A protein has these predicted regions:
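RNA substrate-binding interface of SAM-dependent RNA methyltransferases
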Residues: 1-67
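A generic "binding-loop/recognition-motif" signal
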Residues: 9-10, 74, 98, 131
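Short, charged, surface-exposed secondary-structure boundary motifs
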Residues: 16, 77-79, 127-131
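Short, hinge-like loop/turn segments at secondary-structure boundaries
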Residues: 21-25, 85, 136-137
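Glycine- and other small-residue-rich loops at beta-strand/loop junctions that grip anionic moieties
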Residues: 48, 70, 99, 123, ...
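A short acidic, often aromatic-flanked loop/helix-cap motif at beta-alpha or helix-coil junctions
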Residues: 52-57, 74-76, 125
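Active-site/ligand-binding-proximal alpha/beta "capping" segment
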Residues: 63-101, 105-106, 115-119
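Structured adenosyl-cofactor binding patch, chiefly the S-adenosyl-L-methionine
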Residues: 104-144
Length: 144
C-alpha cells in the first residue's frame, strides 16, 4: 500500500470538516507509520488530505487496475477478477465506500472512468474490515 485517501461520497454519514480533518490526517499518518514499523516495511504509506468523490475516482483510475467495491448489481467476485490476471498489475487502486455504501450514480461514474465493479462476498463488510480483506487477497495472490 502506497497511498491512503479519504473522500466524501453521497451516502457518507460523517461530513468532512476542514477544522478537524488536519487532526484526523495526523492520526492516520501516525497509524500508518506504526503499522509499517510493525510489519517491517521500509515504505510508509502516504496519507493524503480528503478529496471529492470525483477526484478520488480520477486518482484511482490512473492505476493499472481500479477495483470499485460495490454491493449493487453487475459486480464480479474479487476472486474471479484476481484469478483472471496472468500477473498482478503493477498498480492497483481499491475504492471502498463509507458505512452507507455507494449510490448508483457513483457506481456508474466509476464504471464510466474504467473502474472494475467487484463484490466482496455475500456479507456487507465494515469499511475498516473491507480494506483489510481486499489487501489480504492482493498480498496472497502476489506472494504465491
Amino acid at each position: 500500500m502506497e497511498l491512503f485517501t479519504t473522500f466524501q461520497s453521497d451516502r457518507c454519514v460523517v461530513r468532512i470538516k476542514d477544522a478537524s480533518e488536519d487532526r484526523k490526517n495526523e492520526r492516520r499518518r501516525r497509524i500508518a507509520t506504526e503499522a509499517a514499523k510493525q510489519c517491517r516495511r521500509s515504505l510508509v504509506p502516504e496519507v493524503s488530505a480528503a478529496v471529492s468523490f470525483e477526484k478520488a475516482i480520477d486518482l484511482a483510475t490512473e492505476s493499472d487496475l481500479c477495483l470499485f467495491c460495490y454491493e449493487g448489481e453487475g459486480t464480479l467476485p474479487l476472486g474471479e477478477i484476481l484469478r483472471s490476471c496472468d500477473t498482478l498489475p503493477r498498480s492497483v487502486s481499491i475504492v471502498i465506500g463509507s458505512e452507507g455504501g455507494f449510490s448508483e450514480a457513483e457506481a456508474e461514474a466509476a464504471k464510466a472512468k474504467g473502474a472494475v465493479m467487484t463484490g466482496l462476498g455475500k456479507r456487507i463488510l465494515r469499511t475498516e474490515t473491507a480494506s483489510g480483506f481486499v489487501l489480504a487477497c492482493l498480498v496472497m495472490i502476489s506472494e504465491l
